[in-house]
Regions:
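Conserved donor-binding/catalytic core segment of Leloir-type glycosyltransferases
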Residues: 144, 192-208, 214-217
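Conserved acidic donor-binding segment of nucleotide-sugar-dependent glycosyltransferases
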Residues: 316-320, 324-332, 340-346
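Nucleotide-activated donor-binding/catalytic signature segment of Leloir-type glycosyltransferases, i.e.
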Residues: 239-264, 274
Length: 385
């Protein structure tokens, strides 16, 4: 692999899906061939100082918590690139930092890769930011995408010169795996006993559909006595969701765990009998699910999965094989689907086993990291413009 500088706003210990995506790939590249340039992160829950000390690769922190394509960020990126003899640049999120691609190529970058995730779909719908995507597409060698949906939505915005390559999220199937002991521990912690349980692991925001899970719960409980809902994650929507559960008289049947440590996530998946995140597109198409790594993590854990139709979410499920794809705006359909799975453990287990096999064969991080290495090592194809 060409010695690579990863320039990104999104990196641990700051939490989030993009952060986990980039770190999961970064830790699988040769550590001596990677330098990361990312913002500072100081919170009561953790500091970048501890994270960087334990990282296998070098991390250089920007003095503030936000990086934009400014002259200061460009100057620092050039300094790092030259001091560490980096020949490739990888932008963790194309928009907006990959606008620095052209000057970094002039500074000596032989190969430039820019990753996308989902928010670029929104950028592609707004005239000003669409122009920024076009500039990026004309100056980088490769734009990676996480799902066919996102590619179809923003390919035209990046322009005909953009080299588009798929690089979706992966799953560590040794971490996300069936774990009966972890299941019992989490169930005991939250008083779930042997109740049939739907689990959702996600930030509490409207797009993810936790409100629809709560709305569907009364109908589910009519068919599946004792059914409960385990909502794993924190976020601004919690108060609204708590109120909804109280109004629908299911407050005692909905468990809010709040944010949980990353190392406890596999056990929380295991605590469920079915995984569901009925994601729906919002904001006139601007707020959309890029892929939905949680569906794949749930499948790797051996759970049947129920996904919404938003964006690339259906690509993370084999409909009727590893789970079901439903309309995230229809609590009736959602209730019917979940009740059927909860009341048929044999079918649910069969879907979960199929999901684990599918993820192990097609979605492993090691496979994705090898693909990224190939993209970073390729011959330069974009002329300096």
């Amino acid at each position: 692999v060409l010695r690579t500088l990863l320039v990104t706003n999104d990196f641990p210990p700051r939490p989030g899906g993009i952060q986990n995506y980039l770190n999961s790939l970064a830790t699988r590249l040769p550590a001596d061939d990677l330098v990361v340039y990312a913002p500072s992160w100081e919170r009561s829950s953790g500091s970048h100082v501890e994270f960087d000390a334990a990282a296998p690769f070098e991390v250089v922190r920007h003095p503030t918590s936000l990086m934009l394509p400014t002259p200061d960020v460009l100057r620092r990126a050039k300094q790092i690139m030259r001091a560490r003899d980096c020949e490739a640049v990888w932008f963790g999120a194309a928009a907006p930092l990959a606008l620095l691609g052209h000057p970094l190529r002039q500074a000596g970058a032989r190969r430039i890769v820019a990753s996308t995730h989902g928010h670029e779909v929104g950028w592609s719908m707004l005239p000003g930011s669409r122009q920024a995507l076009r500039r990026i597409g004309e100056t980088v060698d490769v734009v990676t995408y996480v799902s066919k949906y996102t590619r179809n939505r923003f390919a035209a915005a990046f322009g005909r010169h953009a080299g588009l390559e798929m690089l979706p999220s992966g799953v560590d199937t040794t971490v996300f795996a069936p774990d009966p002991a972890g299941r019992e521990e989490i169930r005991a912690r939250h008083g779930l006993g042997d109740r049939p349980t739907v689990v959702c692991v996600s930030r509490l925001v409207p797009r993810k559909g936790q409100d629809m899970l709560i709305s569907a719960l009364p109908a589910i409980r009519e068919r599946v006595p004792g059914a409960a809902l385990l909502l794993v994650g924190g976020g601004p929507y919690r108060k609204r969701l708590t109120q909804l559960a109280e109004v629908l008289d299911v407050a005692d049947d909905v468990v809010f765990t709040g944010s949980v440590p990353w190392e406890e996530l596999p056990a929380h998946y295991n605590a469920g009998d079915v995984f569901a995140m009925p994601a729906r597109t919002r904001g006139k198409g601007l707020d959309v699910e890029g892929l939905g790594i949680v569906y794949l993590e749930a499948s790797a854990t051996g759970l049947p999965v129920v996904a919404g139709t938003s964006g690339g979410a259906p690509e993370a499920v084999l409909d009727e094989v590893t789970g079901h794809v439903v309309d995230g705006r229809d609590p009736g359909q959602l209730a019917e689907t979940l009740a059927a799975l909860l009341s048929d453990p044999v079918r649910a287990r069969r879907m979960g086993e199929a999901g684990r096999s599918w993820v192990a064969e097609n979605w492993r991080w090691d496979t994705m990291a090898r693909r990224l290495s190939t993209l970073l090592d390729g011959d330069p194809v974009a002329a300096v413009r």
